[in-house]
């Protein structure tokens, strides 16, 4: 799921979240709508980094 694009979902809330960007190998912020979306959605940058950067699950695809 670290390779999924950022997806704000279908609802209209304005919730700051983070997603992993494999092109830059970094976690970036985006605005989540509150429902829907996908699993590339983290409450904190640290959680995103731990899941996708530090674990080796992220990075450019070979």
Swiss-Prot record:
Pfam families: Kunitz_BPTI. Disulfide bonds join 2-52, 11-35, 27-48. The keyword Disulfide bond applies. Its main location: secreted. PANTHER family: BPTI_KUNITZ INHIBITOR DOMAIN-CONTAINING PROTEIN (PTHR10083:SF374), KUNITZ-TYPE PROTEASE INHIBITOR-RELATED (PTHR10083). Serine protease inhibitor that inhibits trypsin. The recombinant protein also barely blocks voltage-gated potassium channel Kv1.3/KCNA3 (3.70% inhibition at 60 nM of toxin). This is Kunitz-type serine protease inhibitor. It comes from Eristicophis macmahoni (Leaf-nosed viper).
